[in-house]
Design a protein with these regions (language model features):
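Small-residue-rich hydrophobic transmembrane alpha-helices
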Residues: 89-149, 186-205, 312-376, 407-429
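Short runs within selected transmembrane alpha-helices of multi-pass transporters and secretion channels
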Residues: 110, 178-197, 205-213, 234-249, ...
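Short alpha-helical transmembrane segments in multi-pass integral membrane proteins
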Residues: 4, 11-59, 117-184, 226-282, ...
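Transmembrane alpha-helix boundary and packing residues in multipass membrane permease domains
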Residues: 62, 66, 78, 115, ...
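N-terminal transmembrane alpha-helices
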Residues: 46-83, 97-112, 116, 141-148, ...
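Helix-terminus/linker motif at the lipid-water interface of multi-pass membrane proteins
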Residues: 71-90, 159-166, 222-229, 289-322, ...
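Transmembrane helical elements of multi-pass membrane transporters/channels
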Residues: 57-76, 178, 189, 212, ...
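Residue-level hotspots within pore-lining transmembrane alpha-helices
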Residues: 68, 72, 102, 106, ...
Length: 500
């Protein structure tokens, strides 16, 4: 049953500033009724106000969170690399990949739940939100057990297929099995963080991530450097941090979003809600898994060019990752913006958001790409002093970074469409540009003797993806979306959004 919360109405006559303040107060009271949320939460209103401002406020904590994650990865590598041997370092690096492949599908399902939460939030459907959260938690426990078992017993076989060096194999199995015990915490934290983002609260997910990263770093130093536990210590630190972040996210949600009645343990589910989560989440999860496998295929072409070329591509990835942080942040904002405004029936605002947020992402990444390209050699020199490695890294940077803006626009458009729940088209496009464009182009360039320029396939796939997503807005599917939004009720006529 939907909450009986009237939508804000336009006000005529009187002082415009007073009317706007009164409108804002009524809207704030409505969203508090829906979630039962405390006034100090970091929830961003995506349905009203300046589109760019709300998207930027939402994206900024995610951007900082991505930087934190990269910082943690660097510290983790430094600790293991300095207090363990090279075999242990190799084991930690390789053992994470099987877990990522196993978790991809289920993390995609979590993203599906986040999209549905944003849509229910746009509708102000309190009962729907509560049942959706219960169903997501129930499904979380259902998934955690088989994934843990698969990781424990199938993981070693995956490590053999990856040709893990013999001296690192036992370490890798140990790391994999200990971190597999953290599957429930991993899936739980990502599910809860997705729900909070769906509500528009990205600031809280940053704080939760900060707690997790700091815990992980402190325990890494304690277990590996102080207690000398080696690989087992690094794995245990990761597992404890995952469970702490999961439990903290539950406590936070129960305190600040009382209306959601956030459960710790499974407490019933709704078949229709579960079917909706799977309908959106399974294609996203399969897309993630196949995309990961596809990256391995492209990496194989890079490996054929020799260790110097691979090293160059590796450090160039650090620089291109700067633009990647901005792209991920804008794309996350696009998903939630689309979901909430579709749920509220704000089709015209949704149209403006597609243009404004994708253009903002394109401009920001274009500037980052140009600056990083111009100063790429001194930046890359921070990671290596080998002239041959630097030459390969500079070549990679020049082939990719100047065109990274096309990926930003393409990815934001794709995120908008995902936010509306139309994930089939984006899944097909994503797999098409990887398996029909990027991978064949890389192997063709290698076969023609241009293997050291095979990274050009990346920029080519970005351009094809951009054209494919532009084509979506000419398809009947976009027209269906417009009719769906109209059925939900167009609230844009009552909007008093400031002019940008």
């Amino acid at each position: 049953m939907q909450m009986d919360c009237p939508r804000p109405t336009a006000y005529n006559g009187g002082n415009e500033e007073k009317e706007r303040k009164l409108y804002k107060d009524i809207w704030k009271s409505e969203r508090n009724v829906v979630c039962g949320m405390a006034s100090h939460t970091g929830k961003i209103d995506m349905i009203r106000g300046s589109i760019i401002k709300s998207a930027a406020l939402f994206a900024l904590p995610i951007c900082v969170g991505n930087i934190l994650q990269q910082l943690y990865g660097t510290v983790d590598t430094l600790v293991v690399g300095n207090f363990c041997d090279s075999a242990a370092l190799a084991a930690v690096g390789t053992a994470t990949q099987p877990m990522e492949i196993l978790l991809c599908v289920f993390l995609g399902i979590g993203n599906g739940a986040s999209i549905l939460v944003s849509q229910e939030m746009g509708r102000r459907n309190a009962d729907g939100l509560r049942m959706l959260v219960r169903t997501a938690v129930w499904f979380l426990y259902l998934c955690a057990i088989p994934v843990t078992i698969l990781a424990m017993f199938v993981g070693p076989a995956l490590l053999r297929l990856m040709q893990v060096p013999a001296d690192a194999f036992d370490y890798a199995v140990l790391y994999l099995r200990i971190t597999a015990l953290g599957t429930l915490g991993n899936l739980g934290y990502n599910m809860n963080a997705g729900i909070l983002r769906g509500l528009g609260d990205s600031r809280s997910t940053l704080l939760l991530l900060l707690i997790s990263c700091l815990t992980n770093i402190v325990l890494d130093v304690a277990f590996v450097a102080v207690l000398g536990m080696g690989v087992a210590g690094a794995a245990l630190a990761t597992t404890i941090a995952l469970y702490l972040s999961w439990l903290t996210s539950i406590l936070y949600a129960r305190r600040n979003y009382e209306g959601l009645q956030f459960p710790l343990l499974p407490h019933g589910y709704d078949k229709a809600q579960l079917a909706a989560i799977l309908k959106v989440g399974v294609p996203l999860g399969l897309n993630n898994s196949l995309y990961s496998v596809g990256h391995v295929a492209v990496q194989a072409v890079y490996n054929m060019q020799g260790s110097v070329f691979v090293a160059g591509c590796s450090i160039a990835g650090r620089v291109t990752g700067i633009a990647g942080i901005a792209i991920t942040s804008f794309s996350s904002a696009a998903v939630v913006f689309a979901g909430q405004n579709l749920g509220a029936g704000n089709y015209r605002r949704l149209q403006r958001g597609v243009v404004q947020i994708t253009c903002a992402a394109g401009v920001v990444t274009l500037l980052i790409g140009l600056v990083a390209t111009v100063f790429c050699r001194p930046l890359l020199g921070l990671f290596s002093s080998d002239p041959a490695v630097l030459d390969a890294a500079v070549r990679y940077t020049w082939w990719v970074l100047p065109f990274i803006w096309t990926y930003a626009v393409f990815n934001c458009m794709m995120s908008f469409v995902n936010g509306t729940g139309a994930v089939k088209y984006t899944t097909v496009v994503n797999l098409l540009i990887l398996w029909a464009v990027r991978i064949p182009a890389a192997y063709i360039l290698h076969a023609l003797g241009y293997g050291t320029s095979s990274m050009a396939c990346v920029s080519l796939s970005y351009a094809v993806g951009l054209v494919a997503m532009l084509g979506y807005f000419l398809t009947p599917e976009w027209g269906k979306l417009r009719r769906k939004a109209k059925e939900l009720g167009d609230a844009v006529t009552a909007e008093t959004e400031p002019t940008l």
